[in-house]
Amino acid sequence: LMIGGKKVDYDFLKPLYSDLAIHQGEEFFPGYGAGHFVKMVHNGIEYGMMQSIAEGFAIMRKSKYKLHLRKIAEVYNHGSVIESSLINWMGNAFALFGDDLKGVSGRASHSGEGLWTTQVAHSLGISDKVIHESLKARERSQKKPSYQGKIIQALRNQFGGHNLKK
């Protein structure tokens, strides 16, 4: 939980936040909107990470090798430097839908946080090439569904229950 506002209000509600969050999974950020801002940037970072996963698995799928992508996700998630919840969910998606992600539309949608993050970055004069390009890739997949779009949409389904068919 990323909580903004007044410290006095946070302190009063901290027992509730502690009950809702995993151990050390909540933090206070001073100022109204600060918690939402931190969460927005979190989602922008997530866009870039998911796009990298999509690109990497698309490269492996198209290679001359007969690679089992689910097994790759599993080995990546056991001691690899890219071990993560996202890689774990990728393995789960391959287990459910196969390496071709059958039944997943290939149209990767977004809910706005990546766009808002790029808008803030631009207003601050900060380079955001990865986040910006990951947003553009999702927009392109709406017009031309792709395997990378399938990966993004499968991941979104795994962690947020997002629709696979859109």
Can you say where each PLM-predicted feature lies in the sequence?
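Glycine-rich phosphate-binding loops that contact phosphosugars or nucleotide phosphates
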Residues: L1, K6, S18-D19
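Helical "substrate-binding/catalytic lid" subdomain
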Residues: I3, G33-H162
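Short helix-loop capping/hinge motifs at secondary-structure junctions, enriched
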Residues: K7-F12
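Acidic-glycine-rich active-site phosphate/pyrophosphate-binding loop
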Residues: P15-G31, F94-A95
